[in-house]
């Protein structure tokens, strides 16, 4: 199996990685600002608490803890996240591709799979956001919070695995 970005010429991989990495950091910083009004007693981790609510009652409690301004921040953040998804997926996938280098071992195979996995994470993120949008717009019924939590969990697992795999690349030789 080929890495999803293997078609990119070698001389462009690192520059593109740095561009998407910088964009990821910048957008992450914006999300940090957007998340401040979402941190309440019911949602100590802001939007992440909402993503992982899992139950209608928990999602309702979180949504009820947000005033109109916070709900606007949440709605904007859910929409803005659609810009973040391809950005973080490309940054991490390029990072994995660079970490693989010329390796032809089990690490390279797993890192190649994870190159696809981070794009799958972005798809789960998109589905999660749609479910959260349904909840945020007063449609707090099952199965929206449950599906959002499952998608968020899969997304976080794939992203953490991808990040650990990319960072551990230097410890694996051919």
Predicted regions and their residues:
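Juxtamembrane loop-transmembrane helix junctions in multi-pass integral membrane proteins
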Residues: 4-12, 65-68, 72-75, 102-112, ...
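Lipid-exposed faces of alpha-helical membrane segments in multi-pass integral membrane proteins
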Residues: 19-26, 83-90, 113, 117-127, ...
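Multi-pass alpha-helical transmembrane bundle typical of ion/small-solute transporters
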Residues: 27-28, 32, 63-66, 76, ...
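Short hydrophobic alpha-helical membrane-anchoring segments
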Residues: 32-36, 93-101, 126-129, 165-172
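Hydrophobic alpha-helical transmembrane segments
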Residues: 76-99
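Hydrophobic alpha-helical transmembrane segments of integral membrane proteins
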Residues: 97-137
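Alpha-helical transmembrane segments of multi-pass integral membrane proteins
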Residues: 121-170
């Amino acid at each position: 199996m080929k890495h999803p970005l293997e078609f990119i010429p070698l001389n462009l991989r690192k520059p593109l990685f740095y561009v998407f990495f910088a964009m990821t950091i910048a957008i992450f910083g914006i999300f940090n600002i957007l998340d401040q009004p979402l941190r309440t007693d019911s949602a100590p981790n802001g939007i992440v608490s909402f993503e992982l609510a899992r139950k209608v009652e928990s999602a309702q409690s979180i949504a009820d803890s947000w005033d109109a301004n916070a709900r606007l921040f949440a709605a904007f953040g859910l929409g803005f996240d659609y810009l973040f998804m391809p950005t973080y997926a490309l940054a991490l996938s390029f990072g994995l591709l660079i970490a693989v280098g010329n390796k032809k071992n089990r690490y390279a195979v797993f890192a190649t799979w994870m190159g696809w996995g981070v794009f799958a994470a972005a798809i789960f993120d998109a589905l999660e956001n749609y479910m959260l949008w349904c909840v945020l717009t007063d449609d707090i019924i099952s199965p929206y919070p449950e599906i959002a939590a499952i998608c968020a969990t899969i997304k976080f697992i794939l992203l953490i695995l991808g990040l650990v795999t990319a960072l551990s690349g230097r410890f694996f030789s051919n």
